[in-house]
Amino acid sequence: MQTIYTKITDIKGNLITVEAEGASLGELVQIERADGRSSYASVLRFDARKVTLQVFGGTSGLSTGDKVIFLGRPMEVIYGDSLLGRRFNGTGKPIDREDECFGEPIPITTPSFNPVCRIVPREMVRTNIPMIDMFNCLVKSQKIPIFSSSGENHNALLMRIAAQTDADIVIIGGMGLTFVDYNFFVKESQRLGFADKCVMFIHKAVDAPVECVLIPDMALACAERFALEQKKNVLVLLTDMTAFADALKEMAITMDQIPANRGYPGSLYSDLAVRYEKAVDIAQGGSITLISVTTMPGDDITHPVPDNTGFITEGQFYLKDNRIDPFGSLSRLKQLVIGKKTREDHGDLANALIRLYADSRKSAERMSMGFKLSNWDKKLLAFSELFEARLMSLEVNIPLEEALDIGWKILSQSFHSEEVGIKEQLIQKYWPKACLHK
């Protein structure tokens, strides 16, 4: 049932206040202006008869006498195969200059998937990036962010992951993107050959902040339907969650909410968690794997956005100096696949490589301070150069099995077999034969 009101009592930023009854949170509202234009809004808060609405597209040209029509349903997005290869804005309208998209309208705010129907993650998602596949495995239905330092090319990493995984559908949610970023996503998806199975929901930096908040909900609502009804394995890429949090912050300040840490709303943790919890592996169905980008202002990992994110997600990839830092990265689900879905030497070899690389960092520090280096220090430094060039560089693009073989070769070129701390049975089986008695 639609209800029409014509008394707007307050206009502040992209928010308006209307005296109305019977409104519900998230309800979609249509605003008809005196000049014939119309726009949409959603219910953000209500207090007795005062209902606060967030207006999509801004409040410019709005007057207090315009018609406000409560539509009696939540914000919706179109779902169906017609979405594939298309691009939409924060209100669900096409921005790719193609025809209108037709399909089933679905609400964008739904509860997380029923835990009874979830299954324990058990399948590895291969990316051909050694620092992920070898040391911090990505697991199907995992929710994991990329913590990115300033100036890092995290968008290129996202697109590479999207192109090299076996996901049936890729859904990209871009928030606060510049035109250069948006154009990069479009061109790269075409160049890498997955544009036809990709859906993009894009909020540009010039768009209203309230539309930014809707992007993750739209992307995840469509992903959930694809996974549940069509049993598709969906990869959802969200960037940048710091822009999403900043939009929440701006809206909270406009509504005169009492700020919490660094001005962000006290609900920041819940606002992030309700999106990340959409990641799921469905029994006898598909899956949703969620990778997000969280930029760290000032490279500060204690900033409220990465700090709260770390408590919600199942690890993180720490992107720094154009490489994934092994010491700041973690996958809490890797033990579910290492040695079970991968080669038997995977766990021991990865642990040995990281341990020796950590020791090499100490040797490099001693060298920088002018200390005399031992033969062991020199071995570690030689190993470090090989490790960084052949496994850590983001230019490396090889399958996991080849990365494991390269790991053994690096060890054999730098150390004796008894110096690496790996079980003898694995040494006998995988250590390069020409170097076995080195």
From Swiss-Prot:
Gene3D superfamilies: 3.40.50.12240. It comes from the Bacteria. GO terms for molecular function: ATP binding; proton-transporting ATP synthase activity, rotational mechanism. One of its GO terms (biological process) is proton motive force-driven plasma membrane ATP synthesis. The keyword Protein biosynthesis does not apply. Keywords: ATP synthesis, Hydrogen ion transport, Ion transport, Transport. CDD domains: ATP-synt_V_A-type_beta_N (cd18118), V_A-ATPase_B (cd01135). Transmembrane segments: none annotated. Belongs to the ATPase alpha/beta chains family. Produces ATP from ADP in the presence of a proton gradient across the membrane. The V-type beta chain is a regulatory subunit. HAMAP family: ATP_synth_B_arch (MF_00310). This is V-type ATP synthase beta chain. The gene is atpB.
